[in-house]
Amino acid sequence: MDLHELERLRAENEQLKAELASKQHQIKQNDIKSYKGLSFEEHRRYGRQMIVSEFGSLTSQLKLKQCKTLVVGAGGLGCPSLMYLVGAGVGTIGIVDDDLVDETNLHRQVLHSTTSVGRLKCESAKSYLQELNPNVNIITYPVRLSNKNAFEIFADFDLVLDCTDSPASRYLINDVAVYFNIPVVSGSGLRTEGQLSVFNYENGPCYRCFYPDPPAANSVTSCSEGGVLGPVIGLLGTAMAVEAIKVITGFYHNTFKPFLTMYSAYPQQTFRVFKMRGKQKTCLCNHITRQAIESIDYSEFCGTLGPVNLLSHDQRISVHDYNSVRNSDHVLLDVRPKEQFEVSSFPGAVNIPWDSVLSKTTNIDKIDQLQLPPKSPIYVVCRYGNDSQLATKKLLDMGWNNVKDIKGGVSRWYSEVDQNIPFY
């Protein structure tokens, strides 16, 4: 039996133990004394939040217990949101996520553990959450949300948390939520910053009212490309849970005003709250239909950034071909940001970042100042093979003839040639 099989069996055993504990707890609950709709155990469990005046006492706790909340995405935002909503006693929680737990998730997606790697995120989350609070009914949807399955999923819920990281998902979640008149708590985060809002609530604006047009595909940076500080995304997910509790308990009733909260972790932590415009008369949300939603190609609407192909075949080299010339006389130019270069780099590589240096260099004199030997072959590498093409083209356009791009970058080198280097 290999290590992966052992970890799978261990994770399966933990899930079965959690499900058994939940069933046993439910059986006990049938025989436990209750008072005004909550068992004595629930009174003790939630007592410290029920005595907070802003929360709303027993009435608000019962609203949480009766609420059905759907969380789309069990990643960096979804994990803390789920932990605190389940801990707070939301009665039913749905989790939509078809992704698998990966080692690169663990620094920020704190519902998952090392033994969860390879498991469905929604099932890994369920195992943890059932142990956290067996009073909560947790439903998992291990599917990729689409305009074909979203209607059946959303129909049973009172509130949605958008914990996704792509514009296409955000517009889809918004449109289906508007169709069912379900409020949406939406958040996002990248690097050291993030934001959150509440949409489609108290006759307020929807996501489209704020953002009628999607961002350009080449302007959207993912966590894998731009990075993210774990506590930053955790703080934003926790703040989303706070907003969800306020919506569920009616804190904003008749007083809600559209807002956008911006968070920045560096240099000093700051929260800024901006008043936003209300519902727009020209927005699609005023006349949305199921037929219209099902007819939209959300990926096409938001644009997809396909592979960059700026160079001819003879201006590029595969990772295998580069491996065969690696010991010959040449210059390896690594154009990744210096932070990535420091994490993992090839011995002898020269780091001249594309974003901060090469892309801003406008004449050949400045290129000369970079001290690249013009007669030696130059091979250009980046993380995935996109920025390296831009850098190669620029060098070729400015007079360097013996320059080639390494296709697929460090990522492909790691997957196809050599795994004895750190990868991130």
UniProtKB/Swiss-Prot annotation:
Xref: InterPro entries: MOCS3/Uba4 (IPR028885), Rhodanese-like_dom (IPR001763), Rhodanese-like_dom_sf (IPR036873), ThiF/MoeB/HesA (IPR045886), ThiF_NAD_FAD-bd (IPR000594), Ubiquitin-activating_enz (IPR035985)
Broad class of where this protein is predominantly found: cytoplasm
Keyword Translocase listed: no
Cofactor note: Binds 1 zinc ion per subunit.
One GO BP: protein urmylation
Segments forming domain Rhodanese: 326-422
This protein's pathway: tRNA modification; 5-methoxycarbonylmethyl-2-thiouridine-tRNA biosynthesis
Binding site for Zn(2+): C206, C209, C283
Residue positions binding ATP: G76, D97, T104, N105, L106, H107, R108, K121, D165, S166
PROSITE patterns: RHODANESE_3
Listed GO MF terms: adenylyltransferase activity; ATP binding; metal ion binding; thiosulfate-cyanide sulfurtransferase activity; URM1 activating enzyme activity
Keywords recorded for this protein, A-Z: ATP-binding, Cytoplasm, Metal-binding, Multifunctional enzyme, Nucleotide-binding, Nucleotidyltransferase, Transferase, tRNA processing, Ubl conjugation pathway, Zinc
Cofactor: Zn(2+)
Enzyme Commission number(s) of this protein: 2.7.7.-, 2.8.1.-
One Pfam family it belongs to: Rhodanese
GO cellular component: cytosol
Free-text function comment from the UniProt entry: Plays a central role in 2-thiolation of mcm(5)S(2)U at tRNA wobble positions of cytosolic tRNA(Lys), tRNA(Glu) and tRNA(Gln). Acts by mediating the C-terminal thiocarboxylation of sulfur carrier URM1. Its N-terminus first activates URM1 as acyl-adenylate (-COAMP), then the persulfide sulfur on the catalytic cysteine is transferred to URM1 to form thiocarboxylation (-COSH) of its C-terminus. The reaction probably involves hydrogen sulfide that is generated from the persulfide intermediate and that acts as a nucleophile towards URM1. Subsequently, a transient disulfide bond is formed.
Family: In the N-terminal section; belongs to the HesA/MoeB/ThiF family. UBA4 subfamily.
Name assigned to this protein: Adenylyltransferase and sulfurtransferase UBA4
Organism: Meyerozyma guilliermondii (strain ATCC 6260 / CBS 566 / DSM 6381 / JCM 1539 / NBRC 10279 / NRRL Y-324) (Yeast)
